[in-house]
Amino acid sequence: MNIHGFVDLHTHGIGKYDTRTDDYEEILTMARVHAKAGTIAILPTIYSGHINEMRKNLKAVSMAMDMQEKADNRKFGAQILGVNLEGPFLNPVRCGAMDRDTFIKPTLAALNKLIADYEDIVRIITIAPELPGALKVIEKCADMGIRVNMGHSDATLKQAVEAKKAGATGITHIFNAMRPFHHREPGIAGLGLTNSDLYIEVIADGIHLHPLTLELLFNHKPLDKIIIVSDSVRGQKTAKGVVYDKGVLAGSGLTISGAAKRLQLIGIRDAEIIEASIDNPLRYLGIK
């Protein structure tokens, strides 16, 4: 594929670096490594943590963005578009590799404490919509222009529909860390697969989602609502490009470029891959 570069809206880390830091230089290094792999823009994704820890991570990303704005972006690699918060308003039943002890009840006070002074850089937040108080937080985020993804959730279809009505616009790594699809209770996954308005994150490494599942998504979900993400993390990856934490899938070791190659192998057309990895993520953030 002859393209300018990919856009990754969900990356926790790459190589030896990740967002669990208070050092903006590490965030800039992440951006440089991503750029070498063909990614031109990223949304550093902060793990769920205690609010004071997440705020340190937010500050590091904010400072890295400031450094990019003051200098030639090419020096600092992939452009940092803002930040993606994966938590802390998540359901411990669907924690995946996240630290469930950091999950908290969604309240407007907790939201304000988390993002105060950083509202302008928070672009996406993942919330489990079935939690008490979640709908009010979703409504507030939507009013602020923050995209709300449903994820790390045990929500039923009815609860997911209510969240969409409240302002949720996307789904974090569909089928992963959520109630499994069932023929009598489709849950968030079922809504994401069939609804033409909701964007869905797709980890296309062939492990988080079976190749047949990837084909299903590309064949039945409106293409303009599919967003390829890496969900990349730092650390040693397996030969298949995934990272495990105590036997649980903890993230991908791939970049978007690597995911694109996996999609090509299962017959997804280049034009579809380009739309899902460049056009759609930018549109989701309102960037033309």
At which residue positions do the language-model features occur?
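Electropositive phosphate-/nucleotide-binding environments in soluble metabolic enzymes
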Residues: 21-24, 28, 48-51, 55, ...
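Divalent metal-dependent hydrolysis catalytic cores, especially in the metallo-beta-lactamase
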Residues: 11-14, 28-60, 78-91, 118-130, ...
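Active-site gating loops and adjacent loop-to-helix segments of metal-dependent hydrolytic enzymes
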Residues: 4, 33-43, 60, 91-119, ...
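Active-site core of metal-dependent hydrolases
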Residues: 20, 112, 116-236
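Active-site mouth loops of central-metabolism enzymes
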Residues: 13-25, 46, 97-104, 147-151
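His/Asp/Glu-enriched, well-ordered alpha-helical/loop segment
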Residues: 191-200, 219-288
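Metal-dependent enolase-superfamily TIM-barrel catalytic cores that perform enediolate-based chemistry
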Residues: 58-68, 75-86, 93-155
